[in-house]
């Protein structure tokens, strides 16, 4: 039993390549530099981008979420790269800095330059969870930046732009873009992750980086990020959707389909329905922009989809039995198990989101009692 499959958008060639290299992309034995051009050549990043900017006509953000989901069915490492790239493109589409968008959208869509989002810190800043990690001081017409970004994905060694939130000289939180070769920006070695190793994930040190207004994505993150957050989190949810679909399909096929006909049949069908319903709610909320005014509904969707993915992998294990624990037969399951472990901790983590929802419930209860 599997969740409903939408009209296919992922090219057969890309799907086959991802299947062939999923294990190597997870453990880092395949060159991470190849992922971005492969995704770009298949048109993954053009979905949901206006045709006037080089996008695929007749598509919207829901199609972009679906594209990330379908990549994640084959490789969450590749989907993580797709998420970072497509979110950065979304930042430029929403930026009032038209010159910045015009200069960089084409190479980003073509996969010639990587786009990295380091705005997780800013998302937590908006919720009062932590302070901004990069400060700016005025020096004539320039800002001079200092700070650190401890975990950033899609920092392709061949060239990248990274979006970062900074505390402007007047204290306003702003969003800027930094090119990989700007003086004072230093990329660490790749982080030694448990999984998703071919995702070009590293840390960035920012020491005396001088920028002028041409690199400003938006002057006020408090206005900008609530508008961008639904796309940021919605595309991120594609990781959970795709992984859940693949695990449910594997569970249904285990033992020549015996699991789906036996005691696990009902749980598999129920979870597939939950996945379809949660996916539909997510896409509808992002498309309608309801999540801009009601972000707590977005948080609930993110939590629900990550938990569904975890349950799906558990069902795959139960359906596969001991075969899932043997190499090489269980390699695909083992990778999905590690991928599922990542979903609760990617920022905003489930703990952070549940904390925010608990604060909201407490506030509403206090207001009701007043």
Where does each model-flagged region fall?
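A glycine-rich, basic-preceded beta-loop-alpha segment at the flavin cofactor/substrate interface
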Residues: 205-233, 247-259, 283-286
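Generic structural signal for well-ordered, non-transmembrane alpha-helical segments
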Residues: 242, 269-276, 299, 303-310, ...
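Glycine-rich flavin
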Residues: 31-41, 45-146, 153
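C-terminal helix-coil-helix/basic helical segment that borders enzyme active sites and/or dimer interfaces
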Residues: 19-27, 256, 275-310, 314-328
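Glycine-rich phosphate/cofactor-binding loops in nucleotide/flavin-utilizing enzymes
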Residues: 322-370
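Flexible, small-/acidic-enriched active-site or ligand-binding loops
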Residues: 182-210, 221-224
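Extended amphipathic alpha-helical segments enriched in small hydrophobics
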Residues: 235-294
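A short core secondary-structure module
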Residues: 151-185
């Amino acid at each position: 039993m599997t969740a409903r499959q939408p009209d296919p958008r992922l090219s057969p060639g890309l799907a086959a390549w991802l299947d062939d290299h999923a294990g190597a992309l997870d453990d880092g034995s395949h060159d991470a530099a190849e992922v971005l051009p492969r995704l770009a050549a298949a048109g993954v990043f053009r979905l949901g981008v206006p045709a006037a900017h080089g996008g695929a006509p007749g598509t919207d953000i829901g199609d972009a979420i679906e594209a990330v989901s379908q990549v994640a069915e084959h490789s969450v490492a590749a989907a993580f790269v797709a998420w970072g790239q497509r979110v950065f493109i979304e930042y430029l589409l929403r930026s009032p800095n038209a010159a910045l968008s015009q200069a960089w959208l084409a190479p980003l869509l073509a996969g010639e330059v990587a786009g990295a989002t380091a705005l997780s810190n800013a998302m937590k800043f908006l919720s009062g969870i932590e302070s901004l990690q990069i400060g700016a001081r005025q020096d004539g017409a320039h800002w001079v930046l200092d700070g650190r970004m401890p975990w950033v994905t899609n920092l392709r060694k061949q060239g990248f732009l990274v979006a970062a939130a900074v505390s402007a000289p007047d204290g306003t939180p702003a969003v800027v873009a930094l090119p990989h070769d700007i003086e004072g920006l230093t990329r660490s070695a790749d982080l030694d992750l448990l999984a998703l190793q071919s995702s070009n994930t590293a840390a960035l040190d920012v020491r005396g980086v001088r920028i002028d207004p041409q690199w400003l994505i938006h002057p006020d993150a408090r206005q900008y990020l609530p508008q961008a957050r639904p796309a940021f989190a919605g595309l991120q949810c594609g990781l959970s959707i795709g992984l859940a679909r693949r695990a449910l399909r594997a569970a249904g096929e285990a033992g020549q389909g015996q699991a789906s006909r036996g005691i696990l049949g009902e749980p598999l069908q129920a979870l597939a329905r939950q996945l379809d319903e949660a996916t539909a709610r997510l896409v509808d909320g992002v498309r309608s922009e309801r999540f801009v005014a009601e972000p707590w509904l977005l948080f609930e969707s993110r939590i629900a989809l990550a938990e569904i993915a975890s349950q799906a992998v558990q069902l795959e294990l139960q359906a596969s039995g001991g075969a899932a624990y043997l190499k090489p037969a269980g390699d695909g399951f083992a990778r999905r198990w590690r991928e599922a472990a990542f979903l609760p901790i990617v920022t905003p983590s489930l703990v952070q989101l549940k904390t925010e929802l608990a604060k909201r419930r407490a506030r509403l209860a206090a207001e009701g009692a007043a």
